[in-house]
Curated annotation (Swiss-Prot):
Ranges for region Disordered: 111-146, 267-287, 331-370, 387-439, 490-537, 583-625, 797-825, 941-977
Modified residues (Phosphoserine): 187, 262, 302, 380-381, 393, 973
SUPFAM superfamilies the record matches: R3H domain
Sorted UniProt keywords: Methylation, Phosphoprotein
Domain SUZ, chain residue ranges per copy: 232-302
Location of the R3H domain: 168-231
GO MF term set: RNA binding
Name of the protein described by the UniProt record: R3H domain-containing protein 1
Ranges of Basic and acidic residues composition bias in the record: 112-142
The organism's place on the tree of life at top rank: Eukaryota
Biased composition (Low complexity): 391-422
Residues carrying Asymmetric dimethylarginine: 929
Length: 1099
């Protein structure tokens, strides 16, 4: 229903006249009814006139609200009153009613004029005022206000409701409020809250549409509406317009959609059908696509005529297990290579793992694509560790078969991890560069076993001999019973040694033969070209360390016992980086002589014209028949920037199951990359004593900075690890290794610092003398600060470092005179010794340095990082027994879990390994992805030192009569890893007053003394004078008279409070919150050995 735009005033006036006539008739009818009911009233006409006036005013008052109802009812009454009017004419009351009606209308007009605000158009206002006598005022005002703009209200509202969702909500809200206002008879006017001009315009139009009078208040922000006689409720609500619009649009869309879909209806059905088929056959189709992709990839590679082999191999591997395995290899290889281009080559070479090896050729190079080199798996779990093999030792950096095209052969990132290797491949014999004149070279045959890594090392000058072999076992090997045959978990077949016999697992402590072996016949050492230093790189892989959390390298000595040291020494090397996986390398004991199988064929000699490497180190007085066991556990790193795996002799019981995976050790070698200056690596290895068995371990740790040894000046002090070697009670010496000029390229030291045997150097420390080797931070020394403390007899004041010959170079390490200071005082003073070692360029693999029997490792990189490793001597003489295991603390940047290292006998002190802090990565060390490039393999200690350390744990000086000195007090501290809970009784005292001395500070600790706490003073290494560097110095008052000076500042010490119990330490922490002290207690960020802290007590 649409309302007309305008209603003329003429029509309105005629309507009013009709209404007035109807009111008159109604009055007559009412008079007749009253006359019938009340006969007395009919006689008295005057009373009739009064009643007529009253009745006339009553309908006029209610006219504005009940116009239609009065009209309809008057019509009904009009029909009844016609006949009655004929008989009794009406009295002259209409005249009076007209006068009263005009008076009432005049009053209403005046009231409307007062409430209505003057319009903007004055002409329209005057026009409206002229029409006032025509009896319709409020209707005119609303229509004139809205119609002046020429807006069709109905059309405007309908379009707004359909097209503008935001205005639609506003209109619906206004509609509801106006409906509520109209339905409420109590309030004639309503004032809306202030709103914007656009919303006020909407409100004006909605009010006009409802027949309301609408104006704004004095502020001009709010709209006021008033009820009028024309107020109405439209027949259609706003919602109905919206519904109609949606219905029409929906119908239109439906029609368009049906028309458009008629063209591609068949295509859509086909697509849906294809999707359904694909959904039901996804597995089968993937298998087919996978096979087709492999066929296509392999068909592209026509080198070495591999097509026929691939076809035959695919036919053999049709079974489900082979398919699953190859899918896994392909998937892992794709993830490891990281490039789609790499997956082609690496997948091809993975398939070649199953082929039989072709004869080795010294002419093999990268261009020949020796794909039958076994790949190095990237084991996502520790269930399978595949082989790491070396194909040849010719010195050619390209001799290693490419596992994936990494884009740069010089980067040495050879090999993308290719999943699990299950094929047992026969070894490719190879030679290693000579380690020393009497050391056995390390030979790495390509024994492609899944969970074991086999390294063969023979005597110097021998070819690949099965006399010694190393097997890399995963963490699960710790729980394997002795004598078990190692079985490949992927194929279910036992691992095969190079000689064809199954691999039998025997822990180092057992005396059972691992496999029947005979030493190979001695042969002259094969020449190795110095110009190809990267020939013998061992591991070349992007992320090798993630597979080897703990690499166990077990050495099996020769069966006939020709090696005098094989029966006494075992090698232990812990390889571990902060956030990667590590393994323990252990050496197997000499087996009983079994029936000797034929040894593998020796490798062919290298091309002539290449120099033969000379002996790396002299025998130090040992006869040639008794070669010094330098080769034990030593992995040769011929690459200039390859790390050295230092394996010092020692015992390790492989049945301990406490190993935990730690961040991986990355290996990398720069292949065919000429260096501006040949790199050197400082190696540390001990020459075993002829008469004693010992336990040794090299703690080579890789920090988060991915760098250990750096050739950059002012940074090597942060790079080199410390080594502590126990000897007899003698003063400590300071050895400084200067770095050289600033312009030297980044190098790694391959020329080791050699400590010859006592038989050759009378001035060297005698047997049993503790030698402390540590590193002073770069802040104290500008050059390489490698402090070696020799506890030597007072009479010996010089240590002659003999000339040593690099294995692969004619250059020799010049003999260095280590001149000691004045003789040690009788009270046990420190005598400093300076050792200057220049940077001799070495282009070959570094030779292992030589040490004495008992070894301690002290890391003074940041002061309190000294760790002592208790010596275990005479292992063969004493019955080996396992004592309580020790878990050394984790490295602070990244705590890593390491298994416990058990000592050989309970009476001997346990072996504890402490970490070193992270160091920044030095440019020039190689790619940052390969953290061990150009540096020794790292050792990362375990997370928590569990406190069940035997009482024998003490400083080495106490074992050798050096009880007067307390050099190793700070050896018991090490950083705790992030997130570790401190379990102990030691709290650190911090926030002491500035400038306070040590004696004054002790007076402040009265409250702590009352509860039984003991104060330990550990000197800060940064605060020590450079001319008095202490390897493992303590802060005891009795250790050094200098310590007790009144001017000794407390800020130069790390103050620790040891409480009698953990609860007492916790109570002290709680009490300090409420008490006002001049110091603060906090849980120490380091772990401290209580037995060694006892010597640092100030009480």
């Amino acid at each position: 229903m649409r309302m007309s735009d305008t209603v003329t005033v003429k029509d309105e006036t005629a309507t009013m006249k009709d209404l007035e006539a109807e009111v008159k008739d109604t009055t007559r009818v009412e008079n007749l009814i009253k006359s019938e009911n009340y006969g007395k009233i009919l006689v008295e006409k005057n009373e009739h006139c009064i009643e007529n006036n009253i009745d006339l005013q009553r309908p006029l008052q209610s006219f504005g609200q009940t116009g239609k109802r009065s009209k309809s009812s008057s019509k009904l009454k009009l029909v009844r009153s016609l006949a009655v009017c004929e008989e009794s004419p009406p009295p002259p009351a209409p005249e009076i009613s007209q006068e009263n009606q005009e008076k009432i209308q005049i009053q209403l007009t005046q009231s409307f004029e007062k409430e209505e605000k003057p319009s903007k158009d004055e002409a329209e206002k005057e026009k409206a005022s002229d029409k006032l006598p025509r009896k319709m005022l409020s209707r005119d005002s609303s229509q004139e206000y809205t119609d002046s703009t020429g807006i069709d209200l109905h059309e405007f509202l309908v379009n707004t409701l359909k097209n503008n969702p935001r205005d639609r909500m506003m209109l619906l809200k206004l509609e509801q409020e106006i409906l509520d206002f109209i339905g409420n008879n109590e309030s004639p006017r309503k004032k809306f809250p202030p709103m914007t001009s656009y919303h006020r315009m909407l409100l004006h139009r909605v009010a006009a549409y409802f027949g309301l009078d609408h104006n704004v208040d004095q502020s001009g922000k709010s709209v006021i509406v008033n009820k009028t006689s024309n107020t109405r409720i439209p027949d259609q609500k706003f919602n109905e317009h919206i519904k109609d619009d949606k219905g029409e649009d929906f119908q239109k869309r439906y029609i368009l959609k049906r028309d458009n879909s008629s063209f591609d209806k068949d295509d859509n059905q086909m697509r849906i059908r294809l999707k359904d088929d694909r959904r039901s056959k996804s597995i089968e189709e993937r298998e087919e696509e996978y096979q087709r992709a492999r066929d296509r990839i392999f068909s592209q590679d026509s080198l070495c005529s591999q097509e026929n082999y691939i076809i035959d191999k695919r036919l053999q591997d049709e079974d489900a297990s082979s398919t699953q395995q190859r899918r896994q290899i392909f998937r892992v290889n794709k993830d490891a290579s990281g490039r789609s281009t790499n997956s082609h080559q690496s997948s091809t070479e993975n398939e070649l793992k199953y082929s039989e090896p072709r004869p080795w050729s010294s002419t093999d190079s990268d261009s020949s694509l020796r794909n039958l080199k076994p790949a190095v798996t990237k084991a996502s779990s520790f269930s399978g560790i595949s082989v790491l093999t070396r194909g040849d030792s010719s010195g050619s950096s390209k001799s290693i078969g490419r596992l994936s095209k990494t884009g740069s052969e010089s980067s040495g990132s050879v090999g993308s991890s290719t999943g699990s290797l299950s094929h047992i491949q026969q070894p490719l014999p190879g030679t290693a560069l000579s380690q020393s004149s009497h050391g056995a070279p390390v030979v790495y045959p390509t024994v492609s076993t899944h969970s074991s890594l086999s390294f063969d090392g023979g005597l110097n000058g021998q070819v690949a001999s099965p006399s010694t072999s190393f097997f890399l076992l995963p963490l699960e090997a710790a729980g394997i019973p002795p004598g078990s045959i190692l079985i490949n978990p992927q194929t279910g077949q036992p691992f095969i040694n190079p000689d064809g016999s199954p691999v039998v697992y025997n822990p180092p402590m057992t005396q059972q033969p691992v496999r029947s072996q005979v030493p190979g016949p001695p042969q002259p050492p094969l020449p190795a070209p110095p110009q190809q230093p990267a020939a013998n790189h061992i591991f070349s892989q992007d992320n090798l360390g993630s597979q080897f959390s703990h690499m166990s390298l077990a050495r099996q000595p020769s069966a006939d016992g020709s090696d005098p040291h094989a029966a006494m020494f075992q090698s232990t090397v812990v390889l571990q980086s902060p956030q990667q996986s590590g393994y323990i390398m252990t050496a197997a004991p000499p087996p009983h002589p079994p029936p000797p199988p034929p040894p593998p064929p020796p490798p062919p000699p290298l091309p002539p014209g290449q120099p033969v490497p000379t002996a790396g180190y002299p025998a130090s007085g040992h006869p040639v028949s008794q070669p010094v066991l330098q080769q034990q556990g030593y992995i040769q790193q011929p690459s200039p920037q390859m790390p050295a795996c230092y394996c010092a002799p020692g015992h390790y019981h492989s049945s301990q199951p406490q190993y935990r995976p730690v961040p991986s050790v990355h290996y990398n070698s720069h292949l065919n990359q000429p260096l501006p200056q040949p790199a050197q690596q400082t190696g540390y290895q001990v020459i075993p004593n002829q008469q004693q068995n010992y336990q040794g371990i090299v703690g080579v740790q890789q920090p988060q900075s991915q760098s250990l040894v750096s050739g950059q000046p002012n940074s090597i002090g942060n790079q080199i690890q410390g080594v502590v070697i126990p000897y007899t009670s003698v003063p400590t010496y300071q050895v400084s290794l200067p770095q050289g000029s600033q312009g030297i390229p980044h190098q790694t030291y391959q020329q080791p610092v050699m400590f010859p045997n006592q038989s050759n150097q009378g001035s060297m420390p005698t047997t049993g003398m503790p030698v402390y080797y540590s590193v002073i931070p770069p802040g104290q020394q500008n050059n390489l600060s490698s402090s070696v403390g020799y506890l030597q007899h007072p009479g010996s004041e010089q240590v002659q470092f003999p000339r040593t010959t690099s294995p692969c170079s004619s250059q020799q390490l010049q003999g260095h005179q280590c001149t000691a200071g004045p003789p040690p005082p009788p009270g046990g003073g420190m005598v400093m010794m300076q050792l200057s070692v220049p940077n001799n360029p070495q282009s070959c693999a570094h030779s292992p340095p030589q040490w004495k029997q008992n070894k301690y490792y002290c890391d003074h990189q940041r002061g309190q990082k000294c760790v002592e490793f208790s010596s275990v001597d005479n292992i063969v003489q004493h019955s080996p027994q396992l004592s309580s295991p020790i878990i050394s603390p984790a490295q602070s940047p990244a705590p890593a879990q390491l298994s416990t290292l058990k000592t050989v006998r309970p009476s001997g002190p346990p072996l504890s390994i402490m970490p070193q802090f992270s160091r920044p990565f030095v440019p020039g060390q190689g790619d940052s992805r390969y953290p061990l490039l150009g540096q020794p393999l790292q050792y990362n200690p375990p997370a928590v030192l569990h406190g069940h350390i035997p009482n024998q744990q003490g400083q080495p000086g106490s074992r050798h009569g050096n009880r007067g000195r307390r050099q190793a007090k700070k050896a018991a501290s090490t950083d705790l890893g992030a997130g570790e809970t401190v379990v102990g009784k030691v709290l650190e005292i911090t926030e002491l007053p500035d400038g306070i001395t040590r004696m004054e500070a002790e007076k402040l600790f009265g409250e702590l003394f009352k509860i039984g706490a003991k104060i330990r003073w550990l000197r800060d290494p940064q605060s020590q004078p450079r001319r008095h560097p202490l390897c493992c110095g303590s802060g005891d008052n009795t250790a050094n008279p200098e310590r007790s000076k009144p001017s000794d500042l407390a800020s130069t010490y790390t103050v620790l409070a040891t409480f009698p119990s953990i609860s007492a330490a916790q109570n002290a922490l709680k009490k300090q919150i409420n008490s006002v002290n001049k110091f603060k207690l906090r849980t120490s960020k380091k772990h401290y050995d209580f037995h060694i802290l006892e010597r640092a007590s100030s009480q």
